[in-house]
Amino acid sequence: MFPVFHLSGESRRQMLQTALRFPHVFKARAEDSHKGTFGTLAVVGGSAGMSGAPVLAASAAMYLGCGKVWAGFNQDTLPFAVIAGFPEIMLDTADSLAKRQDINAWVVGCGLGTGRAAVGTLAGILTEHTDKPVVLDADALNILSTDAETRNLARGCKNLILTPHPAEAARLLGTTVAQVQADRTAAVRKIGAIFGATVVLKGHKTLVASPDTEIYVNESGNAGLATAGSGDVLGGIIGSLLAQGVPVFEAACAGAWLHGAAADVIKESAGIAAGLLAGEIAPAARWLRNRITKSM
């Protein structure tokens, strides 16, 4: 049974106004579409004990309309034969999935780990898929902060998106969280300049910077997003939009906005801020995307 979401007239007006910035996201689907029309996303992560992270990202990608989604786990064998509640998601080991050539976009790092196997998988993806959009989050960012070879490979990606929280940003810059937070705009621009990437600096009023230093300040969201797995969901949302062909900067900005706006919808509909589960975000984002598209 689908949750019942709603928005007040003023909230709806404000969200519709913001959505005008994201024309590729809120475009109605053609009636003759098929699953291949909406791309294939690969989510790579899930070391032992962290199998839930890629599941959150992959399920979010499905909710946001991706045609097909793979989840790859950095383990010798798959942690489960099928994901309970999400049989639509295809499963593979991380090293095997990294070799596929039919992937339209990648999300790498959700619970990946930072050991030798993780570094090798990340390096392989960055080497073999330089022409595809690649979102790096969590442990993938931690590897970049310590491994010079992988850092150089990342710079060679044409459509790279980094999604650090302040601590990950500090590690990438070799500085402190306090210094990042003292000037978030400078931090997000510097990371973008170092990697030639679009950067999503998460936190209150998430910042998105393009490689040419255009800055988007996200105004959506609330404290309910301060929950484990929220960042994995954001990565899955952005990856889903990329796989569907949304331009990189628009996908990053719209993903950040939808992620926050979904939490706002949940708060307005059910009064939930404290105790919001990460897995509850994407269904609200799906509802919002469809509601806005219908209204455009």
Swiss-Prot record:
Which Pfam families does its entry note? Carb_kinase (PF01256)
List the EC numbers from the record.
Answer: 4.2.1.136
The domain of life is Bacteria
List residues binding AMP.
Answer: K202, G203, H204, K205, T206, G231
ATP-binding among keywords = yes
Into which EC class is this enzyme placed?
lyase
Q: Binding of (6S)-NADPHX: at which residues?
A: A53, G113, H165, D232
InterPro entries registered for this protein in UniProt: CARKD, Ribokinase-like
Q: Which reaction does it catalyse?
A: (6S)-NADHX + ADP = AMP + phosphate + NADH + H(+); (6S)-NADPHX + ADP = AMP + phosphate + NADPH + H(+)
GO BP: metabolite repair; nicotinamide nucleotide metabolic process
Single GO molecular-function term? NAD(P)HX epimerase activity
Is Metal-binding there in the keyword field?
Answer: no
**Residue ranges of the TM segments:** none
Q: Which family does it belong to?
A: Belongs to the NnrD/CARKD family.
Subunit field text = Homotetramer.
What is the designated name of this protein?
ADP-dependent (S)-NAD(P)H-hydrate dehydratase
